[in-house]
């Protein structure tokens, strides 16, 4: 910037100072010429003219240098000043930024919630004891989910579908600090989709249980868990509805008013806590329909399950086996009610307008019969063995029929396909 200023100054001086210097020099030349002429005209004036010429020449020289100095000095000083100012402008912004104070502390309320309760959230892996990794020799992971510690002595709450319906498997729990422990299934309620696990460790961080009955629509909530096996993941949103009846979701055998939220929940979040801004669990993440529509089991209902489970443990009649009574297919599904169908059709172009019933395959467990048979997440089952499938109960009835194979008609996008699945016996 300083070099540019000096260059511009030199150009300016050449353009505007030249006439002044020329005038000074020209006047000096004229005086010399006149003096020479006078000298030639008469010798009697030689001494006088010579004296005058010397004086005039000295005066003209003084006049020329004084004019040049008077003209150049201000511009030189101006150039120096402009270069300094220009240099300062490069170092300082033209508009000073407003200083913001305490914004991070005042508005990072989500981070405060996470800091208060994240240590109690765990990652749950289901290991297939029949298949082993080629390099490590360890059982491969068949599925995964989330949970959270509710007692210091190692009691963990999660979803039932995370830990059951998987024969020849073992359950493994990883804590937030990275420690891993084998877990045993202690109690299961398939109707409410809740289960408890136990790991042999004490002094664990415990999640506080809040009240779901005091929630309001629009209230901020935080979902914690391990979506897609990415443990310690946090998403935030609001409560969309506090009273979403199970009948609206096609879950006819359940009497639960689910919490609906727009917090991002996906595979692996199941069983994790839905937390309010006080760091209290107000729900258990259970299922997702589509982006922005997910559901959690309200914590007030969960407390009833925990009370019944504690009573069964005292009587010695708690859940003993990790295996289901029903044949195993390896999917998590959701009934497509009219409301859910309307939402799906409004959010995606990849669904036939004529579709009026079916079951949405939400998750397919790797290595399961459904996975081997070709089912994929997002498929919609409309028929099994030539019978219409209108809700998840129809799928369970088909499993109980005793037929070896299930011939399914599915929709994958707008394309109709057929797949055959052979469920495993318990």
From Swiss-Prot:
The gene is HtrA2. This is Serine protease HTRA2, mitochondrial. Its EC number is 3.4.21.108. Interacts with th/DIAP1 (via BIR 2 domain). Its main location: mitochondrion. PROSITE patterns: PDZ (PS50106). It comes from Drosophila grimshawi. The chain crosses the membrane at residues 71-87. It is an enzyme of class 3 (hydrolase). One of its GO terms (molecular function) is serine-type endopeptidase activity. Residues 329-414 form the PDZ domain. GO terms for biological process: apoptotic process; positive regulation of apoptotic process; proteolysis. The keyword Endoplasmic reticulum does not apply. Serine protease that shows proteolytic activity against a non-specific substrate beta-casein. Promotes or induces cell death either by direct binding to and inhibition of BIRC proteins (also called inhibitor of apoptosis proteins, IAPs), leading to an increase in caspase activity, or by a BIRC inhibition-independent, caspase-independent and serine protease activity-dependent mechanism. Can antagonize antiapoptotic activity of th/Diap1 by directly inducing the degradation of th/Diap1. The keyword Hydrolase applies. It holds the Pfam family PDZ_6. Gene3D superfamilies: 2.30.42.10, 2.40.10.120.
């Amino acid at each position: 910037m300083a070099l540019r200023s000096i260059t511009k100054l030199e150009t300016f001086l050449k353009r505007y100072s030249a006439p002044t210097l020329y005038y000074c020099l020209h006047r000096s030349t004229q005086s010399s010429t006149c003096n020479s002429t006078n000298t030639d005209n008469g010798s009697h004036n030689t001494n006088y003219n010579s004296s005058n010429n010397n004086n005039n020449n000295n005066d003209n020289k003084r006049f020329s240098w004084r004019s040049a100095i008077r003209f150049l000095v201000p511009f030189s000083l101006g150039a120096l000043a402009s270069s300094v100012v220009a240099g300062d402008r490069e170092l300082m912004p033209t508009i000073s930024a407003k200083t913001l104070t305490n914004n991070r502390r005042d508005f990072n309320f989500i981070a405060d919630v996470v800091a208060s309760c994240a240590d109690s959230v765990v990652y749950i892996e289901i290991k297939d004891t029949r298949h082993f990794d080629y390099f490590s020799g360890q059982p491969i992971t068949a599925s995964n989910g989330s949970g959270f510690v509710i007692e210091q002595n190692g009691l963990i709450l999660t979803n039932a579908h995370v830990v059951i319906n998987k024969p020849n498997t073992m359950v493994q729990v990883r804590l937030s600090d990275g420690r891993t422990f084998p877990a045993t299934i202690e109690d299961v309620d398939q109707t409410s989709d809740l289960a408890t696990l136990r790991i042999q460790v004490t002094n664990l961080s415990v999640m506080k249980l809040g009240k779901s009955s005091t929630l309001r629509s629009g209230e901020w909530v935080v979902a914690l868990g391990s979506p897609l096996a990415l443990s310690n993941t946090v998403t935030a949103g609001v409560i969309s509805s506090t009273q979403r009846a199970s009948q609206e979701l096609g879950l006819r055998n359940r009497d639960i008013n689910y919490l609906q939220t727009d917090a991002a929940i996906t595979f692996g979040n199941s069983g994790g806590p839905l937390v309010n801004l006080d760091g209290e669990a107000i729900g258990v993440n259970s299922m997702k329909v589509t982006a922005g529509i997910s559901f959690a089991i309200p914590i007030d209902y969960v407390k009833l399950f925990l009370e019944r489970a504690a009573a069964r443990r005292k009587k010695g009649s708690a859940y003993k086996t990790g295996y289901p009574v029903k044949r195993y297919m390896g999917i998590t599904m959701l009934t497509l009610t009219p409301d859910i169908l309307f939402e799906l059709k409004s959010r995606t172009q990849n669904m036939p307008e004529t579709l009026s019933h079916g079951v949405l395959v939400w998750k397919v467990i790797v290595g399961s019969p459904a996975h081997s048979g070709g089912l994929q997440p997002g498929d919609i089952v409309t028929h099994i063995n030539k019978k219409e499938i209108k809700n998840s109960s129809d799928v369970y009835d088909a499993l109980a029929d005793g037929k070896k194979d299930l011939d399914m008609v599915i929709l994958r996008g707008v394309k109709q396909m057929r797949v055959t699945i052979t469920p495993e016996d318990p």
